[in-house]
Each structure stands twice: as structure tokens, then as C-alpha cells.
């Protein structure tokens, strides 16, 4: 493997040198690398190495813009070749490995000389070889200082010709760009053209067909008091032409007197087809405004966007604005915005739904205090009267049964004494009556007897009532299909 690499390097270097000798002074950017390769090859073959290389200096001066190619972005092939030589030589003997390493170390010393900056090389060539070009050295130094000063604000552009097959190391590429005048620079700071950032507007502004028209004497004041995030949904008309009413999705009437409100309603009914409205009234006018709206709604002349709102109530106004934004965003998805037939329907549905929810919240959240008081008082009175009646009944029944028992006992004793000659029949009669009264002494038994008698009497009365009703139905000429409905009517 070592011999194969040596032969390959030797053939490539000899071919490059032959092409250089034939072409004369014209050379490429890879000539310095081939010079280093030639030096390494001579050391490995044992030939004499010149103290100074004139080919390196001449080839460095002959670098042109057309010689820069694709090889500027990858690593130098010489490093891979040397690493391959080192790895392959480990398989050979130790003596051969040491000799090769010594030769490579000598070649690397010459390779380091290649990484010298252009300024150092020019100074060495001017002093050692006597080129006699002080003006060239001076011009090169001035170019280097100028490029170093503009390096931070410049953009380097490399012309890609695709004519080079090898690659340069990144350090070598940087030295070339900073040392010669081949790099094409364009300073962004000195450029006459400048990029202007356009102003971007992120605010959403709905079209006129999706806005609410504010009318009335206090319309300007009302529009100024609207928060900024909701102000874009409202518009003030510059003219008092009622024909503009049809161009808006709804009308907000801000009034101070009821006469003005009625006049605006008449104009809306005359020039529009049930345009949705929002009445904004003053404190104390809400009930009368509702009565006026009821008369218009009964005739199906207008559509109510939102219930009347007092201008001084901030919470109600905030709810109105949120409700308006919600409906406008909902109507944006409709295909035909100007034809408000479907829009009016959706608005009426939303308004009715809002009213129902409002009523549910009012009834569910705050129950009537009078209603709860009446229920409490009724239940307490019923329980109290029932307990009192039950206690009174039990006490009175106990007393009555006690008196009756004592009275019947005395009568039985007297009857048995006075009528002692009557025999066993009178005694047995008094004994049976006494036992019957004793069986009724218990409080629980008395209660059960009372309940049974009450139920029996109630059943008798209910049965008599239904019997009279059925008798009346039979006597009246009613069809059999309608007898059930007639019975229900009579019961109600």
C-alpha cells in the first residue's frame, strides 16, 4: 500500500511539473501544494533539497481570480495522504516506520512554510532572492491593511469556476482571502441602497356593511366614550340622510328625550326593512322605552338587536359591546352580508336566547323573598294547627271516655244491688258493657278508630259525588267519545 501511494504521488507531481514547464509562467492555485509534494518526494527518495524554493514564490505570485474553484471549502488532500502513509507504515517493520516518520517531519517543516502569510513571503522573497520590487510590496501591504479594515463590514463572494479537483484547508483559504486582492467585496455600510421596513398594520377594521351606525344628538359623545377595542365596530354618519341606514348592519339610537326616540324609530321603519336597533337611553327612561318598543314589536316593524341599555351603566355597556362583537364575527362567515334576511333571523334568535338566559339567571340566581316567606309561614301554620288539633282531640276523648266509664260503672253497681232478685241476666249485661268500655281505654286504639271512621266517611262522600256526576252525564245527551272530556270539565 505504501508503494502504491508513493507511485501515485510521484506520478501526479511529475505530471503537474511537466504541465508547468510546458505552459511557462502560467500556473494554477494548486502549484504551491505540488511544490510541497515535490519537496517531500525528494526527501523520501534521498535527493538533495534546495535551501530556498523559487518555484513556490513564483507560483504564489501567479494566483489569479479564475483559478479559485470548488476546492476552497474542503480539507487539504495532503493531510489525508500523510495520515494514510502513517497508518499503512504501521504494518511494516519498525525501522522503516521510523525512517518514514523522520522524513515526514522534515516535510512538515517545509509544509509549515507554505502557511506563511503573503506579506511574510513577499518580504522573504524580496530580501533573499532580490526581486527588486519595493513598489509591489508596498502596494500589497496597503491592500492588506485596507482589506483588514473593511473585513468586518464586507461580504466575500467567491467565483466558482469548477476547474480545480483538489481542495484547500480552511486556514489556507482564509490566508488567501486576507492576503491578496482576489476576493470580491461589497461593503454594506457604503452601499447606496437601503432596505426600508414597511409599516404593518395588524388592526382589524370591518367593512361598512359590518358596522353599526350611531345616530342621535349624543352620538358623538357616545362614540368617544366607546373603548378602543370596540370603537371600530361603530360608525358616525356625517350626513343625516336616512338612505344610509340600509348600508349598515344595525343602528344604535342614542337619545335624550322620548320624542326623539320615537321620531328615529319612525324614520327607521320608513327607510329600512326591519333594521336591528339598539336603544341607548338615559337613567329613569328604561321602562317607558320598553313600552314604546313593545308597540313596534307587536306590529313587526323593527328588530331588537339588544334590550335597552342605560348609558350610565358601565356593566351593561360592556355586555353590549361584547355581544355586538360576537354577532358581527358570526355574521362575517355568511356569504351574503348585504341581504340581511338570514342575518335578521339570527339576530332575533340571539336576542330571544339572550332574553331567556337573562330570565333564567334572574329567577335562578335571586329567588323571590316574598315567595319563600309565604311558603315558610304556611308550612309552620299547618304543622302547628295539626299538632294542636291532635293534642286537643286526644285530651278531650280521654276525658270523655273516663267520665263515661265511671258513670256506667256506678249505674251497673246500683242496678245490681237494687235488682238483686232479678238473677244472673242483669249481672251479665253490666259486665259486658264494662268490658266494652275498658277495651276502648287505650290512646292508640282511640286514634286508630278515629282514622278509620274518617276514611270511611270520606269514601262515602267521594263515592256519592262521583255517582251524582255519572248520573248527570248519563242523563245529558253526550257522545260516548266525549264523555271522558265532559267528566274532566265538570271536575275542574
From Swiss-Prot:
The keyword Transmembrane helix applies. It comes from the Eukaryota. This is Autophagy-related protein 32. Mitophagy-specific receptor that recruits the autophagic machinery to mitochondria and regulates selective degradation of mitochondria. Mitophagy contributes to regulate mitochondrial quantity and quality by eliminating the mitochondria to a basal level to fulfill cellular energy requirements and preventing excess ROS production. Recruits ATG11 to the surface of mitochondria. Also promotes autophagy-dependent peroxisome degradation. Residues 342-351 have a biased composition (Low complexity). The chain crosses the membrane at residues 374-390. GO terms for biological process: autophagy. The keyword Transmembrane helix applies. Signal peptide: none annotated. One of its GO terms (cellular component) is vacuolar membrane. It is found in: Mitochondrion outer membrane; Vacuole membrane; Preautophagosomal structure membrane. Keywords: Autophagy, Membrane, Mitochondrion, Mitochondrion outer membrane, Transmembrane, Transmembrane helix, Vacuole. It is a single-pass membrane protein.
